Amino acid sequence: MSAKEVKFGVDARDRMMRGVDILANAVKVTLGPKGRNVVLDKSFGAPRITKDGVTVAKEIELDDKFENMGAQMVREVASKSADAAGDGTTTATVLAQAIVREGGKAVAAGMNPMDLKRGIDLAVEAVVADLVKNSKKVTSNEEIAQVGTISANGDVEIGKFLSDAMKKVGNEGVITVEEAKSLETELDVVEGMQFDRGYISPYFVTNADKMRVEFDDAYILINEKKLSNLNELLPLLEAVVQTGKPLVIVAEDVEGEALATLVVNRLRGGLKVAAVKAPGFGDRRKAMLQDIAILTGGQAISEDLGIKMENVTLQMLGKAKKVMIDKENTTIVNGAGKKADIEARVAQIKAQIEETTSDYDREKLQERLAKLAGGVAVIRVGGATEIEVKERKDRVDDAMHATRAAVEEGIVPGGGVALLRASEQLKRIKTQNDDQKTGVEIVRKALSAPARQIAINAGEDGSVIVGKVLEKDQYNYGFDSQTGEYGDLVKKGIIDPTKVVRTAIQNAASVAALLITTEAMVAELPKKGGAAGGMPPGGGGMGGMDF
């Protein structure tokens, strides 16, 4: 075990504070509509330009181990805010820096760090309660567009795309962001359920121009196993022929004589049929087939349930108003499933999303949820250069998460004003002793930091702006740094999602309180000389050889 270096008290906190400042100062220049860009060097390819706080924070790694510990803890604030609300990362970083700075001074003046922490916790509770009380529900598309515009650093086009996407796929629908190959940004909406499997054979195609299978009012057979034996399929095929309706078979695979017979019947026109491989693998495939069954009002045929293929009846099949299958995707529109069944399945998937610890599983569950709940919207972000597209995509991602958060918990006035107003409530908090009172005061001072920083980034005097805003007693009154005017921020469309502001202050205070209560730090000693160990002096040639 290598030797360690240990720092105590003021020395430890000073080194840590230096790291916090380096990271926070790099991140906070991006805050607000007039925030600046940060250029990130990449080991390969062109540098990356971004205005996204968490992207900047993730790139920062400091040489000094003690400074780096401070920086990494504040980086955690940005990451946690991004995970919980998808935005507010810069605000959270600015708040954490302000609380740590004021808290550090209080500890250096001889106050009890644990009482300071209790005071900070009391203050945060009061701030959250005030935010929730003054939160306003988002109802119109205009408000959704405004939230998107603010979060995308004032880009009106992005706000409009997001509100259109949410209008089309609903609040539960999935919105994915991709890089476009063109200059224009565009929105593409897939209604109904789509999965990434196409037809097994091109002979099933009904629309030769588009190379697509298009069926109206179709039956859907959902089978977990391979189908190769014709005899087990025959009873069902005969029953479907009698109805005159088309049949879509979703199975692990269709091969051999079963596939040959389906193709021949399709070509002769005796049976409108198409076969598709089941999506996913393993347990996920089972779950997705069950989703399709619930959406279409059918039953997933599985040997686990003791149902044999030859015993399948028309009542076990799903139904859909329209099914489209191309080479790569299958889309089922207007399935005949019962609304109550679909809602129960949606609730079940939501519960799984809450429980899972894996990001990959969460992403896949959210995709399944969207397919059941409404559809998928894809925003393809365009731009003149790859660097511009990447920078814009970062902003669209932020804006998408912010609009989701706004729909979930409502909105408050933006520009750091909601936190400024909450700071006025902290004067009334009762504490047990003076140190706790100082803890509350630390948070009260820190709450003006985001509004101050937005003004500074716009070239204004932060203290003057904060003073003028607090003079007026209207909750929504604030400073619009884009135009340099004061007024009702909600009417001007300058709004923040309550969830974003709430998670920013909670995460910032949580990590900052830990930094304030730190008394010792332990890190490995830097290696002396920097040479790798291993070879003895003198080259270490083979014994007995004289070169």
Swiss-Prot record:
EC number of the protein: 5.6.1.7
Gene Ontology terms for molecular function: ATP binding; ATP-dependent protein folding chaperone; isomerase activity; unfolded protein binding
A GO CC term attached to the entry: cytoplasm
PROSITE patterns, per database record: CHAPERONINS_CPN60 (PS00296)
Reaction(s) catalysed (UniProt annotation): ATP + H2O + a folded polypeptide = ADP + phosphate + an unfolded polypeptide
Principal localisation: cytoplasm
Binding site for ATP: T30, L31, G32, P33, K51, D87, G88, T89, T90, T91, G415, D496
GO terms classed as biological process: protein refolding
SUPFAM superfamilies: GroEL apical domain-like, GroEL equatorial domain-like, GroEL-intermediate domain like
Sorted UniProt keywords: ATP-binding, Chaperone, Cytoplasm, Isomerase, Nucleotide-binding
Subcellular location: Cytoplasm
Domain of life: Bacteria
Chaperone among keywords: yes
Quaternary state and interactors: Forms a cylinder of 14 subunits composed of two heptameric rings stacked back-to-back. Interacts with the co-chaperonin GroES.
Record family assignment: Belongs to the chaperonin (HSP60) family.
PANTHER family per record: 60 KDA HEAT SHOCK PROTEIN, MITOCHONDRIAL
Function: Together with its co-chaperonin GroES, plays an essential role in assisting protein folding. The GroEL-GroES system forms a nano-cage that allows encapsulation of the non-native substrate proteins and provides a physical environment optimized to promote and accelerate protein folding.
Name of the protein: Chaperonin GroEL 1
Organism of origin: Rhodopseudomonas palustris (strain BisB5)
Name of the gene: groEL1
